[in-house]
């Protein structure tokens, strides 16, 4: 499998008893299904969020203990989309009453946490290098939005996709105790 597919599949070894799905069933709707009591579930009065990423954190102040590995890894790095979702949710709550203009900006803002984290340091580094002055100028003037008229969006997307999986990308590595602000 490719890395993309392998990260999203759970394969069970049918020759091992601990992988026998028939062991599940008590408390579930059907034999072989993981019971709801062993799945991530949270009821809160403030918020829960889900970005189709990791089960272990759906509220910044309340994390799940490790659950069945079938639900995915625990305490691992969140996607930038998930981190951005938490930031936007916290901003909504801190901002008070939601009006139409604010809802529209949050929904259609086309912003990028990757750009917020990377553009300024990249522009500073590439300006000192001198080989990519034109690219640096475009990114330095970019509004860091992905709007039709945002000059620099395509350049950043190409740049980001070429470096996003580098092991040396961040100066502060992922920390499971600070998953919403690391890596950076």
Give the positions of each predicted feature.
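Long, compositionally biased non-active-site segments enriched in small/hydrophobic residues and glycine
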Residues: 1-184
């Amino acid at each position: 499998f490719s890395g993309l597919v392998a990260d999203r599949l759970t394969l069970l070894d049918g020759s091992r008893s601990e992988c026998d799905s028939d062991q599940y069933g008590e408390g579930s709707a059907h034999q072989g299904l993981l019971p709801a009591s062993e799945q991530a579930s949270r009821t809160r009065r403030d918020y829960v969020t889900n970005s189709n990423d990791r089960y272990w954190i759906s509220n910044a102040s309340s994390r799940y203990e490790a659950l069945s590995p079938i639900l995915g890894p625990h305490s691992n790095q969140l996607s930038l989309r998930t981190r951005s979702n938490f930031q936007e949710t916290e901003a909504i709550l801190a901002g008070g009453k939601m009006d139409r203009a604010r809802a529209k900006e949050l929904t259609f803002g086309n912003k990028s946490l990757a750009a917020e984290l990377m553009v300024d340091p990249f522009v500073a580094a590439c300006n000192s290098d001198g080989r990519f002055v034109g690219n640096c100028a475009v990114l330095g003037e970019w509004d860091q939005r992905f709007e039709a008229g945002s000059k620099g969006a395509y350049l950043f997307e190409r740049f980001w996709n070429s470096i996003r999986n580098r092991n040396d990308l961040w100066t502060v590595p992922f920390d499971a105790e600070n998953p919403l602000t690391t890596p950076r």
